[in-house]
């Protein structure tokens, strides 16, 4: 092709057999900081554990709209939420504190920012000891805010 020429690509019209059912399966959110899995306990506590067999780490990510998700524990039915102080907790019902902006970063990890506090850039994060990190203490570039969605089964 000569310089200055333009080309167009033909549209792909074939159907792909993608396993769409897998998108609906629960995930584990593996934190880059310390190797913890995000966990929502029955009492509403949010922390991390290294125990992959813990039932409280199985999470369902439910899209509200493009880039906006609810994160729900399949075991407790509670939704991940962030209050006005930036504390993570489990909520019995979905509300504005439960909606997070999901973003795939260049390093292939996901970050989750509270939609309610998006202008403050408060991320979901776990400390090196597995405790949840307050939103105001998180910022872009920290390992504490990087999560890798993994399948529940290791096969």
Curated annotation (Swiss-Prot):
UniProt keyword Membrane, yes or no: no
PTM description: In the nucleus, phosphorylated by PKC/PRKCD.
Record-level GO cellular component terms: cell cortex; cytoplasm; cytosol; extracellular matrix; extracellular region; extracellular space; nucleoplasm; nucleus
Pfam family, one: FGF
InterPro entries for the chain: Fibroblast_GF_fam (IPR002209), IL1/FGF (IPR008996)
CDD domains tied to this protein: beta-trefoil_FGF1 (cd23313)
Location(s) in or outside the cell: Secreted; Cytoplasm; Cytoplasm, Cell cortex; Cytoplasm, Cytosol
Molecular functions (GO terms): fibroblast growth factor receptor binding; growth factor activity; heparin binding; integrin binding; S100 protein binding
Positions carrying N-acetylalanine: 2
Coiled-coil ranges (or none): none
Keyword Nucleus set for record: yes
Motif (Nuclear localization signal): 24-27
GO BP terms, alphabetized: activation of protein kinase B activity; angiogenesis; branch elongation involved in ureteric bud branching; cellular response to heat; epithelial cell proliferation; fibroblast growth factor receptor signaling pathway; lung development; mesonephric epithelium development
PROSITE patterns: HBGF_FGF
Binding-site residues for heparin, renumbered to this chain: 24-28, 113-116
Keywords: Acetylation, Angiogenesis, Cytoplasm, Developmental protein, Differentiation, Growth factor, Heparin-binding, Mitogen, Nucleus, Phosphoprotein, Secreted
Subunit and partners: Monomer. Homodimer. Interacts with FGFR1, FGFR2, FGFR3 and FGFR4. Affinity between fibroblast growth factors (FGFs) and their receptors is increased by heparan sulfate glycosaminoglycans that function as coreceptors. Found in a complex with FGFBP1, FGF1 and FGF2. Interacts with FGFBP1. Part of a Cu(2+)-dependent multiprotein aggregate containing FGF1, S100A13 and SYT1. Interacts with S100A13. Interacts with FGFBP1. Interacts with LRRC59. Interacts with CSNKA, CSNKB and FIBP. While binding with LRRC59, CSNKA and FIBP seem mutually exclusive, CSNKB and FIBP may cooperatively interact with FGF1.
Family named by the database record: Belongs to the heparin-binding growth factors family.
Function per UniProt: Plays an important role in the regulation of cell survival, cell division, angiogenesis, cell differentiation and cell migration. Functions as a potent mitogen in vitro. Acts as a ligand for FGFR1 and integrins. Binds to FGFR1 in the presence of heparin leading to FGFR1 dimerization and activation via sequential autophosphorylation on tyrosine residues which act as docking sites for interacting proteins, leading to the activation of several signaling cascades. Binds to integrin ITGAV:ITGB3.
Protein name in the entry: Fibroblast growth factor 1
Native source organism of the sequence: Bos taurus
Gene that this sequence comes from: FGF1
């Amino acid at each position: 092709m000569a310089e200055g020429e333009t080309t167009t690509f033909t549209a792909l019209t074939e159907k792909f057999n993608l396993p769409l059912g897998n998108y609906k399966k629960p995930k584990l959110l593996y934190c880059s900081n310390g190797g913890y899995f995000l966990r929502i306990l029955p009492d509403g506590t949010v922390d991390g554990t290294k125990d992959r067999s813990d039932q409280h780490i199985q999470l369902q990510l439910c899209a509200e709209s493009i880039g906006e998700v609810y994160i729900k524990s399949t075991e407790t039915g509670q939704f991940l939420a962030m209050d006005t102080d930036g504390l993570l907790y489990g909520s019995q019902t979905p509300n504005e504190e439960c909606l997070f902006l999901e973003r795939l970063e260049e390093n292939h990890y996901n970050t989750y920012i509270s939609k309610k506090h998006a202008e403050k850039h408060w991320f979901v994060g776990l400390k090196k000891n597995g405790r949840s990190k307050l939103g105001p203490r998180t910022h872009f570039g920290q390992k504490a805010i990087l999560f890798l969605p993994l399948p529940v089964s290791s096969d």
